[in-house]
Curated annotation (Swiss-Prot):
Lineage: Eukaryota, Fungi, Dikarya, Ascomycota, Saccharomycotina
A biological process term (GO) from this entry: U2-type prespliceosome assembly
GO cellular component, one term: spliceosomal complex
Pfam family, one: PSP
Modification Phosphothreonine, positions: T104, T112
Keyword Cell inner membrane appears in the UniProt entry: no
Record's keyword terms, sorted: mRNA processing, Nucleus, Phosphoprotein, RNA-binding
Protein name stated in the entry: Cold sensitive U2 snRNA suppressor 1
The protein's assembly and partners: Belongs to the CWC complex (or CEF1-associated complex), a spliceosome sub-complex reminiscent of a late-stage spliceosome composed of the U2, U5 and U6 snRNAs and at least BUD13, BUD31, BRR2, CDC40, CEF1, CLF1, CUS1, CWC2, CWC15, CWC21, CWC22, CWC23, CWC24, CWC25, CWC27, ECM2, HSH155, IST3, ISY1, LEA1, MSL1, NTC20, PRP8, PRP9, PRP11, PRP19, PRP21, PRP22, PRP45, PRP46, SLU7, SMB1, SMD1, SMD2, SMD3, SMX2, SMX3, SNT309, SNU114, SPP2, SYF1, SYF2, RSE1 and YJU2. Interacts with RDS3.
Species of provenance: Saccharomyces cerevisiae (strain ATCC 204508 / S288c)
Length: 436
């Protein structure tokens, strides 16, 4: 049944489609017939064109004013301007400024080249045309070595170049142009574990933690997860008993002027894969090695016999001493030649004049003593009286008595401090106590 119904439906659809096609053909035939009739009528009117022309001319004169109002003004067509019209200045008032507003805004943005051809440039194309070359940008700057090739592509390259070359401006880190995340490389996998500074190692905190019960890998394995979480929330107090006097001395006496071995200078930015450990070792070696000494291995490599100065010392006669070592004394140049013994050919001898200047400086935050100016004033007074012949014996006796008394106090204080230090060295206190 279903198949018969579907067959009937398909037959009906085919009949409908055939009827639609027949109707379309009939409509097309009717349209063609109408067109032929209109063409025939047009031929008749053309034959009567001579009689109708007179009538049309009369009607045009009568309805000329009316038809002009309904004509569309063509503003897009360019008009030829004569020489007389160029000299005449005509002011045109727009009746419909809203219609022409879009065109005027576009005309203002467009650049009018010398050829007279209007070309519209986008902001990107304009930036490319106005982009300076690398040589031009470097010539405008006092430090051209700072300028890179990508600085020319900036929105304001001149401003960027002037900012980069100003004093105390830290450069942008180089990882801004890398697509991967900062410090996401594998170089951090081989990073050394953290080590305590030497000054904190003096408190023996590492030994103390290693002697605690359940310390190390075995202790961590024995601890359960619940015990570890409980120890974080509620730690046991008194497990580490430090000698707080030594801890105070580490930070306030021994470590008052302490600083790390290697500190990055101002503007030296850390970058990925930078090995600071090797840099610290190199700086430590440079600080340890001093000029004025040459090893036997270097003498053998240079084929330099003993008792002969290195070749760079001969150059120093013409050029002068290095600016980094102004107090350097070299045998045969500014030092006696008899001091050339073995591996030593020079020595850094600091100038006493510069040292006295450093000692005489007054630093900010120094304690002001009210006793020393009195003694200095009294000395100056006695010298002035001796020169002028008006020396007073009473003042000299008082000054000598005060100086003797002051020196005795200083000697007593120093002796007391030495005794305390000796007692501490003899009886060393235990830095910690292990509580089980």
């Amino acid at each position: 049944m279903a198949r018969t119904k579907s067959r009937k439906r398909s037959g009906n659809n085919q009949n409908k489609n055939a009827s639609v096609v027949n109707n379309k053909a009939e409509i097309a035939a009717m349209i063609d017939a109408r067109r032929l009739e209109q063409k025939k009528k047009g031929g008749v009117t053309n034959s009567k064109g001579k009689t109708n022309k007179v009538v049309d001319a009369k009607l045009e004169k009568e309805f000329k004013d009316v038809l002009q109002r309904f004509q569309v003004q063509e503003n897009d067509t360019p008009k030829e301007i004569t020489k007389d019209e160029k000299n005449n200045h005509v002011v045109i008032v727009e009746k419909n400024p809203v219609m022409n507003r879009k065109h005027t805004a576009e005309d203002e943005l467009e650049d009018t080249p010398s050829d007279g051809i209007e070309e519209h440039l986008s902001a990107r194309k304009r930036r490319k045309t106005e982009k300076p070359s690398l040589s031009q940008l470097k010539s405008q700057v006092p430090y051209p070595q700072i300028i890179e090739w990508y600085d020319c592509d900036a929105r304001y390259p001149g401003l960027l170049a002037s900012i980069k070359c100003t004093k105390n401006v830290i450069p942008v880190p180089s990882h801004w142009q890398s697509k991967k995340e900062y410090l996401s490389g594998r170089s951090l996998l081989g990073k050394r574990p953290f080590e305590l500074p030497d000054i904190i190692k003096k408190t023996n905190i590492e030994q103390m933690r290693s002697t605690l019960p359940q310390s190390g890998l075995d202790g961590q394995d024995e601890k359960s997860l619940k015990e570890a979480s409980r120890a974080r929330v509620q730690p046991k107090m008194g497990a580490l008993d430090l000698d707080y006097k030594k801890l105070h001395d580490v930070f306030f006496k021994i470590g008052a002027n302490w600083k790390p071995d290697h500190l990055l200078c101002f503007g030296d930015v850390y970058y990925e894969n930078r090995n600071l450990f090797e840099e610290t070792n190199w700086k430590r070696m440079v600080d340890h090695k001093r000029p004025g000494r040459i090893s036997q291995e270097l003498r053998a490599i240079m084929n330099l016999p003993e008792g002969q100065l290195p070749p760079w010392c001969m150059k120093m006669k013409d050029i002068g001493l290095p600016t980094g070592y102004p107090d350097l004394k070299i045998a045969g140049l500014n030092w006696d030649i008899t001091n050339l013994k073995g591996d030593v050919y020079g020595k850094i001898i600091p100038n006493h004049h510069s040292r006295s200047k450093k000692q005489g400086r007054n630093y900010f935050g120094a304690l002001i003593s009210f006793e020393t100016p009195e003694f200095e004033n009294s000395k100056e007074d006695t010298q002035a009286n001796a020169e002028n012949g008006r020396q007073d014996d009473k003042i000299d006796d008082e000054v000598e008595h005060k100086l003797d008394h002051f020196q005795e106090d200083i000697s007593e204080v120093t002796s007391a401090e030495e005794k305390l230090e000796r007692n501490e060295e003899e009886s060393e206190k235990q830095l910690y106590t292990v509580l089980k």
